[in-house]
């Protein structure tokens, strides 16, 4: 789908539930969403390839530019990456941005890091039983952002940044990263649809799709609308 991205459909914690995702996309035309962003967890613990395949196929068939990062339990990483690679070939609108970045609409840059981010520089990274990374690795892998200084930046993280307004534990490294790069929008994992500001950056939790929550974000006005999937039709 070509054209400028203004309205972003933000989804968190699919947790392997493909049917609620399909119901969200049934309402896609009326939402006016130009693109989709997904914060893991995508599957459940030790999800098989067919779960990831079904999720990515549903995202691809929605026909919108889509960007995502995996959650802490989307491990082993090899299984997730294999299916992401295959489905990004089948659906060019799909863009995983775990530890990397992807351009969109000539103006936006989506970048992020999934898994649990740990501030301790001596923390061991993990990708087999869960996804966990030391904060310095996030800083290193996302330095690619410096090559796109003229782009409006959107961050995707499954670990929230440290901030008193977010009412929970968070990463000081990610908070500093946000202050350094000044993204327009930061999407983070969390319970319930919520928003906060770190400097000029809007930080949004889209809630959990497995709890029938998601959000619409206006990237121009920086406003957030909580929404829920269409109800299942009785049979």
Predicted regions and their residues:
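Beta-strand-turn-beta hairpins that frame and shape the catalytic cleft
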Residues: 1-9, 101-112, 150-154, 197-203, ...
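Core catalytic region of metal-dependent phosphoesterases/phosphodiesterases
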Residues: 11, 17-105, 206
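Divalent metal-coordination and catalytic microenvironments
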Residues: 13, 36, 41, 71, ...
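Active-site environment of divalent metal-dependent phosphoester hydrolases
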Residues: 15-19, 43-47, 69-80, 102-104, ...
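Short amphipathic alpha-helical segments and helix-helix/interface helices
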Residues: 25, 52-60, 84, 142-145, ...
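Conserved beta-sheet core of the metallophosphoesterase superfamily
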Residues: 60, 65-69, 88-92, 111, ...
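Conserved catalytic scaffold of divalent metal-dependent phosphoesterases
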Residues: 74-173
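A short C-terminal boundary segment appended to hydrolase-like catalytic domains
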Residues: 165-167, 223-235
């Amino acid at each position: 789908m070509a054209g400028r991205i203004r309205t972003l459909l933000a989804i968190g914690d699919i947790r392997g539930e493909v049917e609620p995702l399909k119901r969200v996309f049934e309402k896609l035309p009326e939402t006016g969403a130009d693109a989709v962003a997904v914060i893991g967890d995508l599957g459940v613990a030790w999800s098989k390839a067919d779960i990831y395949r079904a999720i990515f196929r549903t995202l691809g068939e929605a026909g919108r530019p889509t960007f995502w990062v995996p959650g802490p339990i989307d491990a082993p990483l090899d299984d997730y990456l294999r299916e992401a690679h295959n489905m990004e070939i089948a659906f060019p609108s799909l863009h995983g941005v775990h530890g990397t970045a992807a351009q969109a609409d000539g103006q936006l840059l989506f970048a992020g890091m999934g898994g649990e981010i740990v501030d301790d520089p001596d923390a061991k990274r993990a990708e087999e039983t869960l996804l966990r990374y030391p904060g310095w690795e996030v800083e290193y892998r996302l330095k690619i952002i410096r090559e796109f200084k003229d782009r409006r930046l959107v961050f995707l993280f499954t670990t929230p940044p440290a901030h008193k307004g977010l009412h929970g534990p968070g990463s000081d490294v990610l908070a500093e990263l946000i202050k350094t790069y000044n993204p327009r929008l930061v999407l983070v994992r969390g319970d319930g649809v919520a928003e906060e500001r770190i400097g000029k950056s809007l930080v949004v939790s889209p809630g959990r799709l497995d709890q029938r929550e998601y959000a619409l974000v206006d990237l121009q006005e920086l406003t957030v609308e909580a929404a829920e999937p269409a109800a299942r039709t009785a049979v």
